[in-house]
From Swiss-Prot:
It comes from Macaca fascicularis (Crab-eating macaque). PANTHER family: CILIA AND FLAGELLA-ASSOCIATED PROTEIN 58-RELATED, COILED-COIL DOMAIN-CONTAINING PROTEIN 110. It is found in: Nucleus. It comes from the Eukaryota. This is Coiled-coil domain-containing protein 110. One of its GO terms (cellular component) is nucleus. Keywords: Coiled coil, Nucleus. Residues 431-778 form a coiled coil.
Amino acid sequence: MSPEKQPQEEDEVDSVLLSASKILNSSEGVKESGCSGTEYGCIAESENQIQPQSALKVLQHQLESFQALRMQTLQNVSMVQSEISEILNKSIIEVENPQFGSEKNLAFGARIEKDLPTENQEGNLSMEKSRHFKDSKTLHSVEEKLSGDSVNSLSQNINVPSQMHFEDTLTLRTSTDNLSSNIIIHPSENSDILKNYNNFYHFLPTAPQNVMSQADTVILDKSKITVPFLKHGFCENLDDICHSIEQMKEELQKSHDREVALANELQTLKTDPNVQSNDKYDLSPIHQEKMNFIKEENMDGNLNEDIKSKRISELEALVNKLLPFRETVSKFHVNFCRKCKKLSKSEIHRGKRNEKNNKEIPITGKNITDLKFHSRVPRYTLSFLDQTKHEMKDKERQPFLVKQGSIIFENEKTSKVNSVTEQCVAKIQYLQNYLKESVQIQKKVTELENENLNLKSKMKPLIFTTQSLIQKVETYEKQLKNLVEEKSTIQSKLSKTEEDSKECLKELKKIIGKYNVLQGQNKTLEEKNIQLSLEKQQMMEAFDQLKSKEHKTQSDMAIVNNENNLMSIEMEAMKTNILLIQDEKEMLEKKTHQLLKEKSSLENELKENQLEVMQLKEKERLAKTEQETLLQIIETVKDEKLNLETTLQESAAARQIMEREIENIQTYQSTAEENFLQEIKNAKSEASIYKNSLSEIGKECEMLSKMVMETKTDNQILKEELKKHSQENVKFENSISRLTEDKILLENYVRSIENERDTLEFEMRNLQREYLNLSDKICSQHNDPSKSTYISRREKFHFDNYIHEDISSPRSRPLASDLKGYLKVKDRTLKHH
C-alpha cells in the first residue's frame, strides 16, 4: 500500500465514524417515536425525507474537521521519527567522543543536584510511568491527576528538566484528548493551533535557558500528540454500532418471521385443489369497509417498521465501509515500524564502526553481565542507570574545580569515562534488541495484512451477487407495477359484479313472488282437472245408456240408420277430444312435477349463491393481505437499494476530496521538514531530554504491540461478519425466489377469478332468459285458460329440453365440493391464527 493512500483512508475512517454515531443517535430517536402510535406516521415520513440532506451537511463539516486532525497526526509522526534518529545519532556521538559528553553531563548534573537529588526524582517518575500504563481504560483520569501533581512540583522545583518533561507530556495528552473531542479544527488554523500549543506552556513555571529552550518545548508538544487516542475512539464507536445493529436486527427478525408464516399460509392455501375451485365470489360493501379499515391500521403500524429497516440498512452500509478502514490504522503503524527498522539498520552500521574505533575498551565478564542486565531490565529501570551516571559525572567534575593535576585523578577520570562508554554501548545494544522485537511485530502485521487481502478477495464475489440482486429487484419492481395496475382494473370489475349480484338478488325475489302466484294457478288447474274427470265419467255413463238404447232400438235400425251414422261420426269426434283431454292432463301433471323440482332447485341455488358469496369475501380478504405483505417486502428492498446508491456516491466524493488533500499535505510536509531540521540542530545539546523521550517512545512501541493484538481480534471479527453476510445473501436469494413463486401464484389466482366472473355473468344471462321465457309462458297460460288445453307438440318439446338442461347444468353439481373446500380453508385459517 502506497504512503499517499494512507492519509486518505485515515480521513475516511474518521468521517465514517462520526457519521455512524450520528445515524445511531437518529435511529434511537426513531425507536422512541415509533412507539407513539399511528397518529404521527406522516410526520415520521417527512422527517425521513429531511434527514438525508442534513446528514450530508454534517458529514461535510466532519470531513473538514478531521482533515485538520489528520494533518496534525502526520506532523506528529514525522517529528517522532526525526527525534528517534537524532537520539540515536547523539548516543553514537557520545560513544565516539566520551570526554565531550562527560564534561557536558558534569555541568548539567551539577545544576540538578543543587535543587533536588536525582534518585528521588527518577524513582517517582518510574513509579508514575508504571502506574500510567497499567490500565488503558483509566488512562485519561490518571493523566489528569499526574498533570495536577506536576504543576505543584514544578512550582517547588523550577530547575528539574526530567520531571518537567514527563509532566509536560501528561498535560499535553490530556489537552489533545479534550481538543479532539470538543473542537472542530479547519485546515487553515494549523499554524494557530501550533502557536496555542506553544503558549500552553507559558502557564507553567519556566526553566532556565541553559536547561531547556522554547524550541525544545515545541518539539515535545508535537511529539506527544500521537495517533493512539484515535484508535481508542474508533473501537468504542464500532462496539456501540455493532451492539445497536444487533438489537435492531432482532426486531427485524421478528417481523421477518411473521412474514414467513404468512407466506407459508399462502402456499398451503394455493396448493390446495379444493380452495382453487372456490374463487368465484365477491365481497359485500360492509366487509369491504372492514377490510379497508384493517388495511389502514396495518399501514400505520408498518410505517415505524419501514423507518427502522431504513436505519438498519444505513448502519449496515456504514459498518461495511468501516470494516476495511480498520486495516488502514494497522498499516499506518506498520509503516511507522518499518521506518524505525531502517533507522535501526543505519545505527547497526554505525555501531560496527564504533566497535572498530573502540577496540581499546576492555570487555570483561562484568560488562557482559551488564549488557545482559540491560537487555532484560524494563525501560523504566534505565532511569536508575542515569542516576549512577550523573553521580559519576559529579565526581569527575571535582578535579576540574580543585584544579589538581595529579596522575591519580586522571586515571580515575579515564576509568570513569570507560565505564560511561560501556553503559552507552549497553544502551545501544538494548535499542538494537528492541528494534529486533519491532521487526518481529512487523512480520506479524504483514501476516495480518495478507489475511485482510484474502478477506477482500472473498468480498468481491459478494459484491457481484449484490449487483445481480439489485438488477433482479428492478425487474421485479416493474412487474409489480404492472400487477398493481391489473389489480386496480380487477377491483373495478369486482365492484361492477357486486352491483350485478345485487340486481340478481332483487330479480330472484321477484321470481319467488311470481312462483307463489304460479302455485295458486296450479291449484285452480287441479280443480279444473277434477271437474273434467267428473264430466268424463258422466259421458261414459251416457255412452252406456246409449248402448242400451241401441239394443232397444234395433228394431228401429232401418229408420234411424242415418241418425246412427251421424251419431257414429259424433262419437269418433268425442273420442278424439277425450284423447286430447287425457294428453293435456298428463302434460299438466308433468308441469306440476317440473314446477316442484324448479322450486327445490331455486332454493338450493339461493343457498349455493350465499355460500359462494361468503367464500369470495374470505378469498378476497386473504388475497389483499398477501398483496400487502408483498408490497412491504418490495418497499424494504427499494430502501436497501437507495441506501447502497447513496453510500457509493458518498465514497466517490470522499475519494476526490482525499486526492486534493494529499497534494496539500505534500507541500505542507516539505515546508514543515525544513523548519523542523533547523529546530533539531538547535536541540542537539540537550541529550538528557532525548533520553527521556526515548523511554516514552518505548512506551509507544508497547502501545503498538497492543494495537497488533487488537488487529488480530479485529480480523477474527471480520471473518465472523463475512460469514454472517454470506448467510444473509443466501437468505435474500431464497426470499427473492419465494417472491417470484408468490407472484406467479397471484397471477394464476387473478386469472381464475376473471374466468369465474365470466362464467357467473354467462349463467346470470341464461337465468334471465329462462326467467323471461317462464314469465311469458305463465302470462300466456293465465290470459288464455280456455286455450290452455290445446298445447302444441312444439312447446312440449321445448319445455322438456329446458328441464333437461336445468338438471345437467354445472351450477347444480359443485355445491358439495365447494362447501367442503370452504370448511377446510376456514379450519386452516383458524389454526394459523
